[in-house]
UniProtKB/Swiss-Prot annotation:
Lineage, opening ranks: Bacteria, Pseudomonadati, Pseudomonadota, Gammaproteobacteria, Vibrionales
Pfam families from the UniProt entry: YbeY
Compartment(s) where it occurs, according to its Swiss-Prot or TrEMBL record: Cytoplasm
Signal peptide coordinates: none
Family recorded in the similarity comment: Belongs to the endoribonuclease YbeY family.
Summary of the function given for this chain in its UniProt record: Single strand-specific metallo-endoribonuclease involved in late-stage 70S ribosome quality control and in maturation of the 3' terminus of the 16S rRNA.
Source organism: Vibrio vulnificus (strain YJ016)
PANTHER family: ENDORIBONUCLEASE YBEY, CHLOROPLASTIC (PTHR46986:SF1)
UniProt-annotated binding residues for Zn(2+): H113, H117, H123
GO biological process: rRNA processing
Keywords, in A-Z order: Cytoplasm, Endonuclease, Hydrolase, Metal-binding, Nuclease, Ribosome biogenesis, rRNA processing, Zinc
GO cellular component terms listed in the entry, alphabetical order: cytoplasm
Protein's recorded name: Endoribonuclease YbeY
């Protein structure tokens, strides 16, 4: 076992979504350098569920692209469960259009970004953001995608 994926599709229309293999590949290219074995749940949701979760857990009154919920094992308990990613289909699709990015590249970026959050990376402080964005770019380019922050740098 390397990275075990539990994929939950909580959207009515599943046409056009990345495949389970796509999600698995993106996890496999992101997590093992930091943690060789892990279990990750990816839940694809609609904007209503994303909005509710974003409100409940972050105090933000809107849907968001990806939410990361790291698993915190009780003291003394060893588990490979890394955590959950909740990705909002509508937000990802809208952002890809607005940012003029290929849709699959943006899906991959959300998995990479969320996975790094599960691994403890953050982007609250400038130096943290720089480190995290650099890792995201390196991972994305390693999978054949362009720098996800290219438009912001130009």
């Amino acid at each position: 076992m390397a990275i075990e994926l539990d994929l939950q599709l909580a959207v009515e229309d599943q046409n056009g979504l990345p495949s389970a293999q796509d999600f698995q590949t993106w996890l496999d290219k992101t997590i093992p350098p930091f943690q060789p074995q892990a279990e990750v749940t990816i839940r694809i949701v609609d904007s209503q569920e994303s909005h509710q979760l974003n409100h409940d857990y972050r105090g933000k009154d809107k849907p968001t692209n990806v939410l990361s919920f790291p698993f915190e094992a009780p003291p003394g308990m060893e588990m490979d469960l890394l955590g959950d990613l909740v990705i909002c289909r509508q937000v990802v699709e809208q952002e890809a259009i607005e940012q003029d990015k290929p849709l699959m590249a943006h899906w991959a970026h959300m998995v990479v970004h969320g996975s790094l959050h599960l691994l403890g990376y953050d982007h609250i402080e400038d130096d943290e953001a720089e480190e995290m964005e650099s890792l995201e770019t390196e991972i994305m380019q390693g999978m054949g995608f362009t720098d996800p922050y290219l438009a912001e740098k130009e």
